[in-house]
UniProtKB/Swiss-Prot annotation:
It is an enzyme of class 3 (hydrolase). It comes from Helicobacter acinonychis (strain Sheeba). Its EC number is 3.1.26.3. It is found in: Cytoplasm. The gene is rnc. Homodimer. This is Ribonuclease 3. Digests double-stranded RNA. Involved in the processing of primary rRNA transcript to yield the immediate precursors to the large and small rRNAs (23S and 16S). Processes some mRNAs, and tRNAs when they are encoded in the rRNA operon. Processes pre-crRNA and tracrRNA of type II CRISPR loci if present in the organism. Residues 13-136 form the RNase III domain. Keywords: Cytoplasm, Endonuclease, Hydrolase, Magnesium, Metal-binding, mRNA processing, Nuclease, RNA-binding, rRNA processing, rRNA-binding, tRNA processing.
Length: 234
């Protein structure tokens, strides 16, 4: 593993914990949450990611339930899906500069793995699972409320519920008179923890690949990447 931009080497946890608003009692648990499976170490963050997915789904659902009392079940589900996603968790992870602390293999480092939404969002889930195991749901609620306020200028359906696939299709139809196509590249993992990798083509040219916990999530990630390329967003 390279040490470039890996703050575990020089300032292990203080800055990250300050940004998070929580200091881990068990630093090994924190380190595990930051360790991607590519490192081939005895402990990585996959199990914590599994737990964090469930914890965050509950906490965010509860926060939205109380905040948006006027929304029906359909609107609440749509809003939650915008946050409880690879793109949503990546946004929250970047709010605390989590990418700077990830432990990834040399090959992932070379391919900018620490910036990949699939890796970054999974690490965020693992990190919050660690907080839950040490401090419980109340602490997770408090942290998530702070992070949501920090990461989003406005937390409502209009500003959060973005359908990247539809936005991309409208753009490609206007510019190229074609619609994007999506293809399943890989499916792996047990039934309770599937990971799907999709590839997106525009005019038979590959524009993006992305992973997600469902085909729909992976397709949204692909569409988001393609929109960035087409609009020239860095």
């Amino acid at each position: 593993m390279k040490n470039k931009n890996n703050k575990l080497a020089d300032c292990p946890y203080i800055t990250l914990e300050k940004a998070l608003g929580y200091s881990f009692k068990d630093k090994h648990l924190l380190e595990q949450a930051l360790t991607h499976k590519s490192c081939k170490l005895a402990l990585n963050n996959e199990r914590l990611e599994f737990l964090g997915d469930a914890v965050l789904g509950l906490v965010i659902g509860e926060l939205l339930y109380h905040k948006f009392y006027q929304y029906d079940e359909g609107k609440l589900s749509k809003l939650r899906a915008s946050i409880v996603s690879a793109q949503g968790f990546t946004k929250l992870a970047r709010a605390i500069s989590l990418q700077d602390y990830l432990r990834v293999s040399s090959s992932e480092e070379t391919s900018k793995g620490r910036e990949k939404p699939s890796i970054l969002s999974s690490a965020f889930e693992a990190l919050m699972a660690g907080v839950y195991l040490e401090a419980g749901l109340d602490k997770v609620r408090k942290i998530m409320q702070n992070l949501l306020n920090r990461a989003y200028k406005r937390l409502d359906l209009e500003h959060l519920s973005v359908d990247y696939k539809t936005a991309l299709q409208e753009l490609t139809q206007a510019q190229f008179c074609v619609i994007p196509t999506y293809q399943l590249l890989k499916e792996k993992g047990p039934a309770h923890h599937k990971e799907f990798e999709m590839v997106l083509y525009i005019q038979n040219q590959m524009y993006a690949t992305a992973k997600g916990k469902s085909k729909k999530e992976a397709e949204q990630q692909c569409a988001y990447q393609a929109l960035q390329k087409l609009k020239g967003i860095k």
